[in-house]
């Protein structure tokens, strides 16, 4: 099958969409390519789920190692559980796609994106997002699309569209923006403390390119002879919503104005109103239309009650400018922060609370060997900063089985991780591998931003010299027609009733991470800019509270944290330190009880809980790699004797040999007549042969114990020895 191919060019980079050729039994499919990266995206619609009160949409990004010319390293030589990055890309597809389906839709929809080939210069994620829209359109699924996504980088002062992996690494911005003809529907970014204006301009720059990809999808649909199926709301039974509006509006509205109520009390009173209403309906005659509807659909009362509560809350915010807890639209909840709340067995800890949201973060310092190896398709180095986010059921007063982290936990952890990375100290000056774990102890909105704040406190408590502290706030939005209200620091109920969840993290200087999700089909850049700017004073206020808890890194590390020494050796001498079969480096680690890591560039990192042991290991390695010159004089101990001479350790780990003829001016019959093992002697380097062997002499050297060292390289400690 030939299929149809449409191309769109950006700055000399061409994106190709091929339809009608692959996966003919899928509802819709497209092969989307850029360079040598190719992603096959399919969308298929199933039957509706009976009794479902949500959209059963699943989005899966599948990596195949053959895409990078590799064979899996597992025993079965088959791909196993998706790596973390695949999970994050699955979320990246889901987030802009989900709000474009009608909220009444209950059909199973499955989108599968499979990376068939990966070019090291072209990331596959944005291709998968755009492809998901094209496949959905071709499948004939009711959909408020088209939707497309692009990536924006910043090199110097110039924005770069769809940058390569290397350009992303070198640049100060990694921003993904997805949009529809109505506006922006999703934003995700990490940046190197960029200003609010820079980020807004980057979103605007990206959205212009999004429109080109939207036009390409519309063209493909037209050329295929297909018509986009626009969602049409089915006729719904309005008897129950009408009854609730008539009988429950007053008590709900009155309750929403009781600003002093706690979340728990408000929820209980709402349940009371719903229960009273249900009892009234139950007392109606059996042939009453409302009672019949409730009997037919047992979930209808709960769904309709939630919808009415949501409507009344939104009206209160739009008309009165007051939220359910009485806060002004730009007001942050009460904040508390505390550092070092756990014993120093934990290297660093911080407790951050904002309203009813409470997060405990811990920081652990590890050695270079603790870095996380990234076993995925992307050409990425090992991770030296890791953030894990846990959301146990008790945090929302519920019970459920404790399982492995889900997509939400992985996504929130990645966002908090991205927010901190720009302020981490350089590896050369602080070579620790860092792991932060954020335990959500109580949740009422914005736990991911609470994790960012808790991480900062824990890292400073652990003695990590951050460039600047980072805080975060979640922004919300209520939009009714032309009326727009932006909410600062949204809580759980406002996330439910609102149209946007916009998380912004950064330092006093600028933004380090942001993530925007919509429940609308698009939002103008102007409103997005207002939300970003409104987040700045909130972040500053939160930072001030955090600094009161801890304003700089601890001067001393936990006594239970490893001590690291780092210095550089000639890369050509790495083999000398490692030795045949690793014998030399193994001997050093056993002798000094340390852990030693050597990078390809020659950076040696020694880890030990004993600073003296680390220094001893450093001296041995420096001795092994130090160049010895003819004529130098050393004092060392006799380590072993052979019939033709004696070996002397002239430097830690480095030996030379005194030939029997060089032991004395006089003739020597037996080596032991002059020296024995353990004797301390002063020797001169007579020559270094072409195999690097050091030949020594005792002739003419006064044996008075004097030592003369060739100038030693000055070690560069990366963390203080304590």
From Swiss-Prot:
GO terms for molecular function: 3'-5'-RNA exonuclease activity; magnesium ion binding; polyribonucleotide nucleotidyltransferase activity; RNA binding. It is found in: Cytoplasm. One of its GO terms (biological process) is mRNA catabolic process. Residues 562-621 form the KH domain. PROSITE patterns: KH_TYPE_1 (PS50084), S1 (PS50126). The keyword Magnesium applies. It catalyses: RNA(n+1) + phosphate = RNA(n) + a ribonucleoside 5'-diphosphate. Involved in mRNA degradation. Catalyzes the phosphorolysis of single-stranded polyribonucleotides processively in the 3'- to 5'-direction. This is Polyribonucleotide nucleotidyltransferase. PANTHER family: POLYRIBONUCLEOTIDE NUCLEOTIDYLTRANSFERASE (PTHR11252), POLYRIBONUCLEOTIDE NUCLEOTIDYLTRANSFERASE 1, MITOCHONDRIAL (PTHR11252:SF0). One of its GO terms (cellular component) is cytosol. Disulfide bonds: none annotated. The gene is pnp. Mg(2+) binds at residues 495, 501. Its cofactor is Mg(2+). NCBIfam families: polynuc_phos (TIGR03591), PRK11824.1 (NF008805). It comes from Prochlorococcus marinus (strain SARG / CCMP1375 / SS120). Its EC number is 2.7.7.8.
């Amino acid at each position: 099958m030939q299929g149809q191919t449409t191309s769109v060019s950006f700055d000399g980079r061409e994106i190709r969409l091929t339809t009608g050729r692959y996966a003919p039994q899928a509802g819709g499919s497209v092969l989307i390519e850029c360079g040598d990266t190719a992603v096959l995206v399919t969308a298929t619609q199933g039957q509706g789920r009976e009794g479902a009160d949500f959209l059963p949409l699943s989005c899966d990004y599948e990596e195949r190692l053959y895409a990078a010319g590799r064979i899996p390293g597992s025993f079965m030589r088959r791909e196993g559980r998706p790596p973390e990055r695949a999970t994050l890309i699955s979320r990246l597809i889901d987030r802009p796609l989900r709000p474009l389906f009608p909220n009444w839709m209950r059909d199973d929809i499955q989108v599968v994106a499979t990376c068939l080939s990966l070019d090291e210069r072209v990331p596959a994620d944005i291709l998968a997002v755009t492809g998901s829209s094209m496949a959905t359109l071709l499948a004939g699924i009711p959909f408020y699309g088209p939707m497309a996504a692009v990536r924006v980088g910043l090199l110097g002062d110039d924005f770069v569209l769809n940058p390569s992996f290397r350009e992303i690494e070198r640049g100060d911005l990694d921003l993904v923006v997805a949009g529809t003809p109505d506006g922006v529907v999703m934003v995700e970014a990490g940046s190197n403390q960029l200003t609010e204006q820079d980020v807004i301009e980057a979103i605007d720059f990206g959205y212009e390119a999004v429109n080109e990809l939207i036009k390409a999808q519309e063209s493909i649909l037209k050329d295929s002879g297909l018509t986009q199926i626009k969602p049409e709301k089915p006729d719904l039974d309005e008897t129950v919503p009408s009854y609730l509006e008539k009988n429950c509006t007053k008590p709900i509205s009155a309750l929403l104005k009781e600003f002093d109520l706690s979340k728990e009390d408000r929820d209980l009173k709402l349940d009371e109103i719903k229960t009273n209403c249900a009892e009234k309906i139950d007392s109606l005659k059996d042939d009453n239309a409302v009672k019949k509807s409730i009997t037919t659909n047992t979930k209808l009362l709960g769904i309709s009650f939630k919808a009415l509560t949501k409507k009344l809350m939104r009206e209160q915010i739009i008309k009165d400018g007051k939220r359910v807890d009485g806060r002004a639209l730009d007001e942050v909840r009460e904040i508390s922060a505390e550092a070092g709340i756990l014993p120093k067995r934990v290297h660093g800890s911080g407790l951050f609370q904002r309203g009813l949201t409470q997060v405990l973060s811990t920081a652990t310092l590890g050695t270079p060997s603790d870095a996380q190896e990234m076993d995925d398709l992307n050409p990425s180095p090992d991770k030296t900063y890791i953030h894990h986010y846990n959301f146990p059921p008790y945090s929302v007063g519920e019970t459920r089985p404790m399982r492995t982290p889900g997509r939400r936990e992985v996504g929130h952890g990645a966002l908090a991780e991205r927010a901190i990375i720009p302020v981490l100290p350089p590896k050369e000056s602080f070579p620790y591998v860092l792991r932060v774990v954020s335990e959500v102890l109580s949740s009422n909105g914005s736990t991911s931003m609470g994790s960012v704040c808790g991480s900062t406190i824990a890292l400073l408590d652990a003695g990590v010299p951050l460039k600047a502290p980072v805080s975060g706030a979640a922004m919300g939005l209520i939009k009714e027609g032309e009326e727009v209200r932006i909410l600062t620091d949204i809580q759980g109920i406002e996330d439910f009733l609102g149209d946007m969840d916009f998380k912004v993290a950064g330092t006093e200087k600028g933004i380090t991470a942001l993530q925007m999700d919509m429940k609308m089909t698009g939002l103008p850049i102007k409103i997005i800019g207002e939300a970003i700017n409104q987040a700045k004073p909130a972040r500053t206020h939160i930072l001030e509270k955090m600094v009161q808890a801890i304003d700089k890194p601890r001067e001393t590390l936990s006594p239970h944290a490893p001590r690291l020494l780092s210095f550089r050796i000639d890369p050509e001498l790495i083999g000398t330190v490692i030795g045949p079969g690793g014998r030399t480096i193994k001997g050093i680690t056993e002798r000094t009880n340390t852990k030693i890591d050597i990078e390809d560039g020659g950076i040696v990192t020694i880890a030990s809980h004993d600073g003296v042991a680390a220094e001893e290991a450093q001296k041995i390695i420096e001795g092994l790699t130090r160049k010895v010159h003819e004529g130098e004089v050393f004092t060392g101990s006799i380590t072993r004797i052979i019939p033709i001479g004696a070996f002397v350790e002239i430097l830690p780990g480095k030996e030379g040999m005194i030939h029997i003829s060089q032991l004395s001016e006089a003739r020597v019959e037996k080596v032991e007549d002059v020296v024995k093992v353990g004797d301390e002697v002063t020797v001169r380097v007579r020559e270094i042969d072409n195999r690097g062997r050091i030949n020594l002499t005792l002739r003419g050297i006064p044996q008075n114990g004097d030592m003369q060292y060739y100038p030693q390289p000055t070690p560069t400690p990366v963390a203080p020895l304590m």
